[in-house]
Amino acid sequence: MRHLVHSTTTRASIFATIHVPATLHLMELLEQSGLRTYVGKVNMNRNCPVYLREISKNQAVRDTVAWIEAAEKFEKTKPILTPRFIPSCTDDLMYALSEVRRQYGLPVQSHLSENFSEIAWVQELCPRSKCYGDAYRQFGLFGGDHRCIMAHCVHSGELEQELMKENGVVIAHSPESNINLSSGVAPVSRFLDNGLKVGLATDVAGGSHESILRAMMHAIQASKLRWRLQDQSVPALSFDRAFYLATMGGGEFFGKVGAFRDGYEADIVVMDDSSLDHPQELSVRARLERLVYLADERCVREKYVAGEKVL
C-alpha cells in the first residue's frame, strides 16, 4: 500500500482474495489513501487449492453480496465483480455472478487468453463457445451493458478482438507478467490500430513491481522483441503510445481521466528529476522519457487525485 501511494499511480483496479474480511480491509486502506480504485473479491470454486476454494456456488454468491453491500460505505473505493477466470468458476457460479452484476450494476474484471493451454482448457469447458471471450459473453460477463476489464489478451484472435471492440471491453496489457510467465507478447499496436480499448497494468505478483513507469518501459521493450522475432506486421510501441496506455488508455475505464483537457478530472503527479544527472540540457520530452526509464517513487514529490492532494 505504501508503495502504491508513493508511486505514479492515481487509479487502479485490483484483485483481492476470496475472503470478505481481507477484501474489505484492503478497501478501507485504499479509501484512506485518497486513490480512486476498484477492488474485487475474487470468486473461484474449482481447479484451485482447497484453502482458496469457495465451498459452494450459493455460499460464494452470499459472500459476494455481503461484500458488495458492506462496501457501500466507501466513496473512493468501489467493488468490481471478479471471477478469477473461467477454469476456476463453475458454470452455475458464472451465471449467478451475472445476475449479481445486473442487480447491483457492477463492472467486471477477469483474465482472457493469457496462454495457449488456458485457451484450450476453456474450449474443453465451454465447447459451445466460439472463443474464450465468447464464453464470457454467454455468461453475461463480457461488457456491452456493463464496463469490463480483461487482463492479458496475449493470444486473442480476430473474432475475440471483434467481440471486445463491440462490447467496449478494456484490455489490461500486462507486459512484465506476460514475460515472467512466458505467456508471450500481446500485439498491442494492432489492438490500438483496430480501435480496441487498452490500458496498462502491473499485475502484481505476476509482475514484480507496482510502478506504471516500469510497466511502460516493459511494454515498449517487449513490443520491440515481438516485432523483431515474431511478427513484423505489428509495429513496436512508440513512447507516445506507451504513455497513452499508462494515462488515457487505462483512465478511460474510470471516466474522463488521464489528460489535461477540459472536463477531465485533475489527476496530477509532480516529479523531481534533478537527481537524474545529464551533461546536456534536455527538452521536456526527453526529460519525460528519461523519467520513464530511470525514475522510481523517490522522484514523486506530490500527487493529486481528482484535484485532491493525496501526497
Regions found by a protein language model. Name each.
Residues 265-311:
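C-terminal cap of metal-dependent C-N hydrolases
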Residues 21-154, 159:
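Metal-coordinating catalytic core of metallo-dependent amide/deamination hydrolases
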Residues 134, 138-144, 189-277:
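His/Asp/Glu-enriched, well-ordered alpha-helical/loop segment
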Residues 42-45, 114, 175-179, 204-206:
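Short, acidic/turn-prone active-site loops that include or flank metal/cofactor-
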Residues 1-22, 87-93:
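Divalent metal-binding segments
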Residues 8, 30, 81, 111, ...:
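Divalent metal-coordination and catalytic microenvironments
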Residues 157-159, 165-202:
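A conserved active-site cap/scaffold subdomain adjacent to cofactor or substrate pockets
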Residues 2, 28, 95, 161-162, ...:
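Alpha-helical segments flanking ligand/cofactor-binding loops in enzyme cores
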